[in-house]
Structures are given as C-alpha cells and as structure tokens.
Design a protein with these regions (language model features):
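N-terminally biased helix-coil "hinge/interface" segments that flank
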Residues: 1-195
Length: 195
C-alpha cells in the first residue's frame, strides 16, 4: 500500500539510451566565433595517435547547427562585447533552424556568465515573439568549470536529453502521485539522488 512507502529511489538508463540510440532532441548550439568546431575536434587526445582510420561518432549537434556568436570573453574581462544586434541576429539564426533545445557554450562563461545570460534572454524573447517554446541550456549553469570541450559537450548532452527526461520523469511522478505514492528521488551516476 502507498501509505507504507516513505521514499522511492528510481534509477533509469533514459539518458544513456537517448545518447546511444541517437533519439534525443534537435539541438542548435551557440558557440564563440572561431570555436564552432569544438565538439567535432574533441580533445585531440587519442589512444592510437597515428591511426588515421579511427572513427568517432558524430556529436549530437551537427556542424550546420552550431551558430557562431561574435563575442569574446577573456580571463578577467571582455575582449569583444556581445551587442544587442548580435544577440538578435543569433536568436533569429537559431530559431530559424527549428530546435527543440538550444545549447549556449561561450568561451570563459564559467568565469563570467554575462554573455550567455544575455544571449539566453534574447533567444527566449524571440521564441516568445514567434509563439515557440524552446528550452535554452547555458554552459555556466550546467558545468561552471574551465575546459571548453568538457563544458560544451556536457551542455549539449543536457540539451539533447532534457525534453525526453522531463517527459519521462514528469509522467512517472504524476502516475505515482495519482496512486498516493511520494515523488521519486532519481539516482545519479555519482551515487546520490535528486528530487
């Protein structure tokens, strides 16, 4: 009986399956101009350095769906400001590609989130003006750490999985609540749980 259940811990492979089966959301990414190839280039650390036949799977966002953003932060300051005109141009270019989610991964955002936040606001505003509902995922919120590739890859993975995970967990929570059970805590790969 539901009355005897105090906690529910739920483990799932939803995200792993989405990534392996390539069934995630349609993602458009925004990256600092000059760094739009970051996900394709990866870290350049290979176990078989001279194996020219080595193949990596394509990233969840294709090169044609990465929009260059003309801005540049440097440690300790702004080298090239992100203008309102550039925000409007990027927002339009992103939404013209009809994404489910948008991943914003600008250089040095772990240290200064201003440009990512400014761009996220512009995209949300333009989406609302077009009557669209689009999730915007910023790298400074997902993984506020140095190392551009890791931060970008993690942010894109979050954007790729978010809609399906939200739908799955929302449905699970609703069904449990309808039967009188408490909301589940979701187990993480790091060993903890999340509400």
């Amino acid at each position: 009986p539901a009355a005897q259940v105090a906690h529910i811990a739920h483990g799932t492979t939803v995200v792993t399956n989405l990534l392996l089966e390539r069934r995630g959301a349609r993602v458009v990414a925004c990256a600092t101009a000059g760094f739009t190839d970051l996900l394709e280039l990866r870290r350049q650390e290979r176990a078989s350095l001279y194996d020219l036949t080595l193949h990596h799977p394509d990233p969840p966002v294709g090169h044609g769906d990465v929009v260059a953003v003309h801005e540049r932060l440097v440690p300790g300051g702004v080298l090239q400001p992100l203008t309102p005109q550039e925000c409007a141009r990027v927002a339009s270019a992103v939404l013209d590609r009809e994404p489910d989610t948008v991943a914003i991964t600008l250089l040095h955002a772990y240290e200064n989130a201003a440009h990512e936040s400014q761009l996220a606001t512009a995209i949300a505003r333009e989406a609302a003006a077009r009557g669209l509902s689009v999730d915007v995922v910023c790298s400074h919120a997902v993984l506020p750490e140095m190392r551009e590739y890791e931060r970008s890859a993690t942010t894109v993975a979050e954007a790729y999985a978010r809609p399906a995970v939200r739908l799955y967990l929302g449905g699970l929570s609703t069904r449990l609540a309808q039967q009188g059970y408490p909301a589940p805590r979701v187990m993480t790969s790091s060993g903890g749980t999340l509400p």
